[in-house]
Swiss-Prot record:
Database matches in InterPro entries: ARM-like, ARM-type_fold, Chaperone_Ric-8_A/B, Gua_nucleotide_exch_fac_Ric8
Result, substituting T440D: Mimics phosphorylation; partial ability to fold G-alpha proteins
Naturally occurring in which organism (per UniProt): Rattus norvegicus (Rat)
Stated name of the protein: Chaperone Ric-8A
Effect of S435A: Decreased ability to fold G-alpha proteins
Gene Ontology terms for molecular function: G-protein alpha-subunit binding; GTPase activator activity; guanyl-nucleotide exchange factor activity; protein folding chaperone
The organism's taxonomic lineage, starting at the top: Eukaryota, Metazoa, Chordata, Craniata, Vertebrata
GO CC terms in record: cell cortex; cytoplasm; membrane; plasma membrane
Gene expressing this chain: Ric8a
Effect of A415W: Strongly reduced ability to promote guanine exchange of G-alpha proteins
PTM-bearing positions, type Phosphothreonine: T440, T442
Length: 530
């Protein structure tokens, strides 16, 4: 039924005709997410009529039908202004049983009404900044958090739980004040960690899950997304012993998530949200990833269970096949693996054995090939600076932050970006808590080491001499042409002579020489003026 006909029926006020018109409209547009511009004014008129009835109170008998129509029209951005009012939002919050000013409904609420109201609120908060502001002012997050805390005691349908969590996610994603309120005032990390444990159906010390059912997967992903929103700066925050224990408890549940498969084809998506949240944990809490007890069939390395680290590495390999949104795909898992390797020697040595095994092929450039090392070295020259930074950082840590070792595995040309950023172009080693790892060279590498081009990282075929057959006069002529070309480029500032500062940073040659001379003068006691 057309919006104009439905609006006409509403204006007549005849209940049966109105109900039938709304039901017909709902059936026809249940899967409509885009709308015809030609009927925009009719839809806006219908929305205003619905709002007037909503604010006065919907008939209990046909409440679900009215809310379904509101939900459909709330997808239309041209109708948002009508619905995004304080009175409309309050009415929807009351039907969803999350209005802060209302007493809890004594009798069990109508779950169909509650669900439709939640869906309407999700649509409005997603698309309307005004609705976002009003929802924050109405403190809807308080009653939502209360209901999430009741999931252990009261049985709510899957869809109600899912849209409770979806609304929490939208509010925390779009409103900084709601994010802080849930984190601090409502103890959101503890609340949602408990909800995650309930959803997974495991305790931290129990055996890992095998497959998480579809509905539990959907709810778990929403919980992970909300937790990500409210803990995004936890990695930078100093935490006390109580908070550290809570984050470790959360980490053990995330360990279950990493090891579990999701029903259907959502495993990679599920693991993606898990890895995103792992990246928010305080660094000292990542030790839980290596705390899994050894059991039959587990992957042991240096007496430590590496099942979780191996699963994260397998996830990284899958993500490296992505061709779009590479930063979102690989940066989180690379960051988690980097910190695990930096802080835990067994993890670093295990990852190095998998990613940077002893070099044998010395005739292929490090970025060429299908090995994990080759793919990561290719990322070191990616256009996205964040992608190349995390890839280089990961490989650098696997090399125990040793510059010669890093160059050996990646080539100086690929390594130059990180070395320049770290002030290590002249070599050396940054401060770091690393033991002296052995880096055993293969026989193939030792034999070819003297012939390896450090810039490309491989043995280069000897190129032909371009001056072969030239007379001395011709050679001198070509040399002067080259000098003149460089001089012209330099004078027009297309290129600039560079040098190495005493601190290991690339700088202009003139500045580098000045800094070197200043350093020599300051260290020479005889150079002080009289």
């Amino acid at each position: 039924m057309e919006p104009r006909a439905v609006a006409d029926a509403l204006e007549t006020g005849e209940e049966d005709a109105v109900t039938e018109a709304l039901r017909s409209f709902n059936r026809e547009h249940s899967q409509s997410f885009t709308f015809d511009d030609a009927q925009q004014e009719d839809r806006k008129r219908l929305a205003k009529l619905l709002v007037s009835v909503l604010e006065q109170g919907l008939s209990p008998k046909h409440r679900v039908t009215w809310l379904q129509t509101i939900r459909i029209l709330s997808r239309d951005r041209s109708c948002l202004d009508s619905f995004a009012s304080r009175q409309s939002l309050h009415a929807l919050a009351c039907y969803a049983d999350i209005a802060i000013s209302e007493e809890p409904i004594p009798q069990p609420p109508d779950m169909d009404v509650l669900l439709e109201s939640l869906k309407c609120l999700c649509n409005l908060v997603l698309s309307s900044p005004t609705a976002q502001m009003l929802a924050a002012e109405a403190r809807l997050v308080v009653r939502l958090a209360e209901r999430v805390g009741l999931y252990r005691k009261r049985s709510y349908p899957h869809e109600v739980q899912f849209f409770d969590l979806r609304l929490l996610f939208l509010l925390t994603a779009l409103r900084t004040d709601v994010r802080q309120q849930l984190f601090q005032e409502l103890h959101g990390v503890r609340l949602l960690t408990d909800a995650l444990e309930l959803t997974l159906g495991v305790a931290p010390k129990e055996n890992p899950l095998v497959i998480l059912p579809a509905q539990e997967t959907e709810r778990a992903m929403e919980i992970l997304k909300v937790l990500f929103n409210i803990t995004y700066d936890s990695v930078k925050r100093e935490v006390d012993e109580e908070d550290a224990a809570l984050y470790r408890y959360l980490g053990t549940l995330l360990r279950h998530c990493v090891m579990a498969d999701a029903a259907g084809d959502r495993t990679e998506e599920f693991h993606g949200h898990t890895v995103n949240l792992l990246g928010n944990l305080p660094l000292k809490c990542l030790d839980v990833l290596l705390a899994l007890e050894l059991h039959e069939g587990s992957l042991e390395f240096m007496g430590v269970n590496m099942d979780v680290i191996n699963a994260l590495l397998a996830f990284l390999e899958k993500r490296l096949h992505q061709t779009h949104r590479l930063k979102e795909c690989v940066a989180p898992v690379l960051s988690v693996l980097t910190e695990c390797a930096r802080m835990h020697r067994p993890a670093r040595k295990f990852l190095k054995a998998q990613v940077l095994p002893p070099l044998r092929d010395v005739r292929t450039r490090p970025e060429v090939g299908d090995l994990l090392r080759n793919k990561l070295v290719r990322l070191m020259t990616h256009l996205d600076t964040d992608v190349k930074r995390v890839a280089a950082e990961f490989l650098f840590v696997l090399c125990s932050e040793s510059v010669p070792r890093f160059i050996k595995y990646t080539g100086y040309g690929n390594a130059a970006g990180l070395l320049a950023a770290r002030g290590l172009m002249a070599g050396g080693r940054p401060e770091g808590q690393y033991s002296e790892d052995e880096d055993t060279d293969t026989e193939e590498y030792r034999e070819a080491k003297a012939s390896i081009n450090p810039v490309t990282g491989r043995v280069e075929e000897k190129p032909p001499n371009p001056m072969e057959g030239m007379t001395e006069e011709q050679k001198e002529h070509e040399a002067m042409k080259l000098v003149n070309m460089f001089d012209k480029l330099s004078r027009h500032r297309l290129i600039q002579p560079m040098g190495m500062s005493p601190r290991g940073h690339l700088t202009s040659l003139q500045d580098a020489m000045c800094e070197t001379m200043e350093g020599q003068l300051s260290s020479d006691p005889d150079s002080d003026p009289d």
